[in-house]
């Protein structure tokens, strides 16, 4: 959804007030810890569980797997869920303004110590799973996990779990004794291992060279045993496992390696979550510096999950850390991503994480990190702070970027930057939901405005550490008043004076200076800021967040279909819960009209699914093509494009599982229904349909299936 809104020209009498006096801060349902669908009002703190705090030494691994000194960063160091609980209870996280934590994958991992190039390695990171239905005992018991959920919720903190359904653990096709042979267990019962895989639980196509999307999906990541999601047992197992963690009360899911799993299976996986207990879900698809991937944005817009915004992270690092781009490049990223993401405010923004060098360098200027944090916390999206950033941790690539947290100081400037800015996401909807507009710029300085209705925040950053910036001609949407810097001057910010028409008085922004000024007011007409989940079947309750909905029930529209009465589960001024009506599957615009009939903005790209989803692999043989021509699939349901060649599924693959002239693709389709479908060849705008009658297939009610047919001339 594009959130550029018209500026208003309604001005008040001259006031010398800060925002705190202009508008009192009050709790709203959209900002509640119970809102599992919307994280735009939250600040996430990513915790590598083993490296955060050791709250229970009794659960530390023994022998070669453990290094209490944390000298070998590839061994366990002792961090656990009790340690996180302790740091919630003592106020370290809440004092920083953190309202969501993202923890390492909680499932049971392998116990083997693997020697790579003379260095012992363990599953301290949580990504070498063996049983997705049990806990990693080094982190804690199932009761410890429940205690973490309860403690976090009692302190208004949501809990996101990492989840890695792409693979189990390292394995060797030649040596079944290597590590644990990638074995997969179901609550303690062995399902199978990588060698002698008679049940076809895993892929066996060798390791990926990352040359194509297909190559990365169906071949192993390094030596990790790659799960076969087209296997019904694997499919049902993983979906049952995530339901178990949802039942335990998790509020969000980060899905690892989404680029390396079938997109159709992932859509059915998301449908399972959204049709069961929907929570905010985001995936990891790595992008390099200056990389813009159409497939990346298509996944974000069509899979039902958001993404870690690597495009944002890489550009922020270029501009604030490495000085390899300037503020015009930053502006271009913000404006370009606004177009490419259907819901830009749902993407998870960050400046570093466990898969890249830490932002701060050992001898680097701390102000660079502080400015990057301020930028992330006030920009569109859902900000995620990597543990230790507030303590200026440095470190190169894995494992040096995963060291033990050295301190829990609450007096660092970085901690205080987070502390002062994080609450804005709940108190000012311009930060949570607003559009972004550049208001003043040169190579080293950017002043941008976030705006939602008449709520406004203005952010000024001068990355030049030696030269002040003379700011003249600045015009904002702030009302006529004098505004104190929300940061309180800790980054050398200043007061901003705004006159008639939003014109700011000239001022000097100090070298390395950063300031935030804001204004809030109540909305009198409805404005939608967030909808979640963005994909589900009829009858599922979704959450609409925003402002100005009023206290009495109005109407929610899915396209032209009006929903009123009992199908509106709850209606408050900042949040509506509504059941998806019984409309045909497809893409819909959502809008709201309050009880007085005032209409909201349109929130677009909502997908109504035809029903519950399963994954079907469609295989077409003998489909020869000309150079530049590809094979696609369409059919009579929205999941297959409703017979529209422009919305057909594909291009299909033809290199790994099957080879040309056989093509294949894994597709999410309605469960337990007889569907019609056909294949077609496309080259640009030229479409060639296969002959014969429409094909039919009755999909399974659960699990997966394969359709294997020949091209009809």
From Swiss-Prot:
Residue numbers spanned by region B: 166-229
Cofactor(s) essential for the protein: Ca(2+)
Cited SUPFAM superfamilies: (Trans)glycosidases (SSF51445), E set domains (SSF81296), Glycosyl hydrolase domain (SSF51011), Starch-binding domain-like (SSF49452)
Region of interest: D: 523-609
Disulfide bonds: 70-77
SMART domains membership: Aamy (SM00642), Aamy_C (SM00632), CBM_2 (SM01065)
Residue numbers spanned by region C: 434-522
Record's subcellular location: Secreted
InterPro entries in UniProt: A-amylase/branching_C, A-amylase_C, Alpha_amylase, Carb-bd-like_fold, CBM20, Glyco_hydro_13_cat_dom, Glyco_hydro_b, Glycoside_hydrolase_SF
Presence of the UniProt keyword tRNA-binding in the record: no
Region called A2, residue ranges: 230-433
A GO biological process held by the record: carbohydrate metabolic process
CDD domains: AmyAc_AmyMalt_CGTase_like, CBM20_CGTase, IPT_CGTD
Protein name in UniProt: Cyclomaltodextrin glucanotransferase
Organism of origin: Bacillus sp. (strain 1011)
């Amino acid at each position: 959804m594009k959130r550029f809104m018209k500026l208003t020209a309604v001005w008040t009498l001259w006031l010398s007030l800060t925002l705190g006096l202009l508008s009192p801060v009050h709790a709203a349902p959209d900002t509640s810890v119970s809102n599992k669908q919307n994280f735009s009002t939250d600040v996430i703190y990513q915790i590598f569980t083993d490296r955060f705090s050791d709250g229970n030494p009794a659960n530390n691994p023994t022998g070669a797997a453990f290094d209490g000194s944390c000298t070998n960063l590839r061994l366990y160091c002792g961090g656990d869920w009790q340690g996180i609980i302790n740091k919630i209870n003592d106020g370290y996280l809440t004092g920083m303004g953190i309202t969501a934590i993202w923890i390492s994958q909680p499932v049971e991992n392998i116990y083997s110590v693997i020697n790579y190039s003379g260095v012992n390695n363990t599953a301290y990171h949580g990504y070498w799973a063996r049983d997705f239905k049990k806990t990693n005992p080094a982190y804690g018991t199932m009761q410890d996990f429940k205690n973490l959920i309860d403690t976090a919720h009692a302190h208004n903190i949501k809990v996101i779990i990492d989840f890695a359904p792409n693979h189990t653990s390292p394995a060797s096709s030649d040596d079944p004794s290597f590590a644990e042979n990638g074995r997969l267990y179901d609550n303690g019962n062995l399902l199978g291992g990588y060698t002698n895989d008679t049940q076809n639980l895993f892929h066996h196509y060798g390791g990926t060279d990352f040359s194509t999307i297909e190559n990365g999906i169906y071949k192993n990541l390094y030596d990790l045993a790659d799960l076969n999601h087209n296997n019904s047992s694997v499919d049902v197992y993983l979906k049952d496992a995530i339901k178990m963690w949802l039942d335990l009360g998790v509020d969000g899911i980060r899905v690892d390696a989404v680029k390396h799993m079938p997109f159709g299976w992932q859509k059915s996986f998301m449908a399972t979550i959204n049709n069961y207990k929907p929570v905010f879900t985001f995936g990891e698809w790595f992008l390099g510096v200056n990389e813009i991937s159409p497939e990346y944005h298509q996944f974000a817009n069509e899979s039902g999950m958001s993404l870690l915004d690597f495009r944002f992270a890489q550009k922020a690092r270029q501009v604030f850390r490495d000085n390899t781009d300037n503020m015009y490049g930053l502006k271009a990223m913000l404006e370009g991503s606004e177009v490419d993401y259907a819901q830009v405010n749902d993407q998870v923004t960050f400046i570093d994480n466990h898969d890249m060098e830490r932002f701060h360098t050992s001898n680097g200027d701390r102000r660079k990190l502080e400015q990057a944090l301020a930028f992330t916390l006030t920009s569109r999206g859902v900000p995620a702070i990597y543990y230790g950033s507030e303590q200026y941790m440095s470190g190169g690539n894995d494992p040096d970027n995963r060291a033990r947290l050295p301190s829990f100081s609450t007096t660092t400037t970085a901690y205080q930057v987070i502390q002062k800015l994080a609450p804005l996401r709940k108190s000012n909807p311009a930060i949570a939901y607003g559009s972004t507009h550049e208001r003043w710029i040169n190579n080293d300085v950017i002043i941008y405005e976030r705006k939602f209705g008449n709520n406004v925040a203005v952010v000024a950053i001068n990355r030049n550490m030696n030269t002040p910036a003379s700011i003249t001609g600045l015009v904002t949407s702030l009302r006529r008043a004098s505004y104190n810097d929300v940061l309180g001057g800790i980054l050398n910010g200043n007061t901003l004076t705004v006159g008639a028409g939003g014109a700011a008085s000239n001022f000097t922004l100090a070298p390395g200076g950063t300031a935030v000024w804001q204004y809030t007011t109540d909305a009198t007409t409805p404005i939608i800021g967030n909808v979640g989940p963005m994909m589900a079947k009829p009858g599922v309750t979704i959450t609409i967040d925003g402002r100005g909905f009023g206290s009495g029930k109005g109407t929610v529209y899915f396209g032209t279909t009006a929903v009123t009465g009992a199908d509106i589960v709850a209606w408050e001024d900042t949040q509506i819960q509504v059941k998806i009506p019984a409309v045909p599957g497809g893409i819909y615009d959502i809008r709201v009209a309050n009880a007085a009939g005032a209409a909201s903005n349109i929130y677009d790209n909502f997908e109504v699914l035809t029903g519950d989803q399963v994954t079907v692999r469609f295989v077409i043989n003998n489909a020869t093509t000309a150079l530049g021509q590809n094979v696609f699939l369409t059919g009579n349901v929205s999941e297959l494009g409703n017979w529209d060649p422009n919305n057909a599924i594909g291009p299909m693959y033809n290199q790994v599982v099957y080879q040309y002239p056989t093509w294949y693709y894994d597709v999410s389709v309605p469960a337990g229904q007889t569907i019609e479908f056909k294949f077609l060849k496309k080259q640009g705008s030229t479409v060639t349909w296969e002959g014969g009658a429409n094909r039919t297939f009755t999909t399974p009610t659960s699990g997966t299936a394969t359709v294997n047919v020949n091209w009809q001339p």
